[in-house]
Amino acid sequence: IYTYVIGRG
């Protein structure tokens, strides 16, 4: 999963 908050997938 990729989120703009975490910036990781």
Swiss-Prot record:
Keywords: Cell wall biogenesis/degradation, Glycosidase, Hydrolase, Secreted. Induction: Inhibited by citrus PGIP. One of its GO terms (molecular function) is polygalacturonase activity. It comes from the Eukaryota. It is found in: Secreted. On the 2D-gel the determined pI of this protein is: 9.4, its MW is: 44.5 kDa. One of its GO terms (cellular component) is extracellular region. GO terms for biological process: cell wall organization. It comes from Diaprepes abbreviatus. Its main location: secreted. Disulfide bonds: none annotated. Its EC number is 3.2.1.15. This is Endo-polygalacturonase. It catalyses: (1,4-alpha-D-galacturonosyl)n+m + H2O = (1,4-alpha-D-galacturonosyl)n + (1,4-alpha-D-galacturonosyl)m. It is an enzyme of class 3 (hydrolase).
